[in-house]
Amino acid sequence: MRTESTRTRPIIPEIVAHRGYASRFPENTLRAVRAAFEAGATHIEVDVLLSADGVPVLMHDATLARTAGRPGEVAALTWNDLARVEVAERSRLGEAGAGETVPSLSQLVRLLEAHPDTNAFIEIKRAALTRFGVEVVISRVLHELEPVQERAIVISFSGDAVRQARAHGARRIGWVLERYDDDALSEASRMAPEFLFCNYTKFPPSPQRPWVGPWDWVAYEVTDAAVALDLAARGVRFMETMAVAELMSALGAQRQ
């Protein structure tokens, strides 16, 4: 007689590639996004700033120092200038990222169109909001995202930005929490975003579940499978990670 296993199968979370497959390739580049898709990720997250002439580009930092190894502000350069800036992150990756340049949001949209089963979280950075104003940034970003609007989710630390995105027709929005406290819960309840992002270290200790609401949770930066499984068991649907293939492989082993 065959004995059925009584071991409960773990809940396997979904993966969000944080700035693409950024542990192996330069963050926020088309190469990093392609690599994430090739590794099997169906959700990616990228950061957006505006160039001097108002073109949305994929960049996390307001300056070029860390990723490009040169002085200068993103908002001080036109798109034509930024398109020639190499963002190889040589101090972190050596020559592995050689030749990668700053991509525009429109270039990412074309890549998403070539991968119709994927979704993208588009994080609008506060530096852009401060420099250009919320209305301008939201308008420019949503315009670029129109071809993939059903699969693109505008997110930000700025509650005002995501509220404006909703008001201007964004299908789905996500709020990135700075704090996990009662004030943030009240704001999230009023905003009712489809997604809440949070640094997983800010969650209450296990086995407590994070707030329940009309949102799905996205926890970042998760690289450990045990942490991911614990969070998933507590109701967190997505794990955001730069170590895309590594975490997916470790979680895949749990399905055996």
Model-derived segments and spans:
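Phosphate-group recognition and catalysis centered on beta-loop-alpha active-site segments
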Residues: M1-Q256
